[in-house]
From Swiss-Prot:
The lineage of its organism: Bacteria, Thermotogati, Thermotogota, Thermotogae, Petrotogales. GO terms for molecular function: alpha-1,4-glucan glucosyltransferase (ADP-glucose donor) activity; alpha-1,4-glucan glucosyltransferase (UDP-glucose donor) activity. It comes from Petrotoga mobilis (strain DSM 10674 / SJ95). Pathway: Glycan biosynthesis; glycogen biosynthesis. This is Glycogen synthase. The gene is glgA. GO terms for biological process: glycogen biosynthetic process. Synthesizes alpha-1,4-glucan chains using ADP-glucose. It is an enzyme of class 2 (transferase). HAMAP family: Glycogen_synth (MF_00484). The keyword ATP-binding does not apply. It catalyses: [(1->4)-alpha-D-glucosyl](n) + ADP-alpha-D-glucose = [(1->4)-alpha-D-glucosyl](n+1) + ADP + H(+). Keywords: Glycogen biosynthesis, Glycosyltransferase, Transferase. Its EC number is 2.4.1.21. ADP-alpha-D-glucose binds at K15.
Amino acid sequence: MKIAYVSYEVSPFAKAGGLADVAGALPKYIKNAGEDIYVVMPFHKNIENNYDISKFEVVKTGLIPDSHTHKSPFSVYKSYLEGSSVVIYFIKTDSLYDSKNIYDEENIFLKTSYFCDSALKTIKECEPDTNVININDWHTSLIPVYLKTHYLQDNILKKIATILTIHNIGYQGLFNPEVLNQAGLPNYLFNMNALEYYGKVNVLKGGILFSNIINTVSPTYAKEIQSEEYGYGLEGILKVRSEDLFGILNGIDYSIYDPLKDPHIFHPIESYEDKLKNKTSLQEYLGLTKDENITLISFIGRLFEQKGIDLISKIMDLLLLNDIQFVLLGTGDKKYEEYFVTLTKLYPKKISINITFDVDLAQKIYAGSDIFLMPSKYEPCGLGQMYSMRYGTVPVVRYTGGLKDTVSEYNPKDKKGTGFGFHEYKEADLLYTLMKAIYFHQKRKDDWTNIFENCMKEDFSYEKTAKKYIELYKIALDKKRGY
């Protein structure tokens, strides 16, 4: 079985969010499990800035997408995912993908639709024996639409099965109906049984309806998106396709997130004593009061309400009355950036606010915190809670999506559980849960050590995830063949 993994972002070449981490890791583990897999992505401008492309192999030049009206030629460059033998093909054209922000909204439909058609041309020219295409989110969702319209009679492409992985259903790709002509797609697709959605073209809807199989990135999220609360208007068609909808939990790359070998952290972590060394080193590094008994709480993520940053901001004044420290790393909504920066002036030894994204600092925070805060409004999977547990940091979460699937409530009676959580999206519930965690950290030291050990024993490696994706590829292929 040969699989094409198609993504608009792939780490480390181009990264805007968690999708890039998945796309940069999962194919390696699928390859290690014995399947033939390769990756396709656009050649974004920053790749040329950050890599010596003379080391990339130019495998095709002068290709033109078959269906799309934008007939600018493209070249196909070939390299490998870091530390692996997984081939990655880059689609390079001089007229597109030159923004610093890869999701720059200017001409985003042109960029994504051109990429979808060009990816199919690349597959046909470079890997004609491909069996399955795994697409990701709305940016690649026109691939199955092209396959079931323009390429329906193509001798090579018509045999390929498709899987759509939804990483966040809140992003759907809504455009005026004229874009169908630009993409070279038939106008009959603009109807309620295809891509039409309240007078707009909904690209993700097309991916859902035209793919053989759909999956999302946690079992709970697969159920949630079939409800009005979480479905963002697509719950109806997801219910219709519920038999073809699966949830597979993301993993994390243990070769990168390794508490024994991570070059970014202060000390290797094998024991709780090692954990405390990282904590006091982090306190010193950030200019906080150096004291291993203070509860160090951290948040790493985008400062948007989806991540629960509004709840966090509402409880900060009360939270800071306690013997705690708070570390934040991330960027986002300006009002939250400004609010947290202002707090540092009031509590300089209790708060460290870092309005940036810094991989080195992120690893240090995961390794040095006592509590990792993730009170998301919704969370398809979430990686931060897995990273934190990998380094023995206890997650406090809202039980939604992948957070519900990965964090179990600590029970002092049987000593099982990896964290603390709440259900209702309310600041009072968050504050109560945090105070409970702080109490266990400061007053129940034996229990806290148990939770630390439970976190360190959790297995979120991609080996398990890869096996489930391989099973899903086989299901998609059987469905395509009519079995």
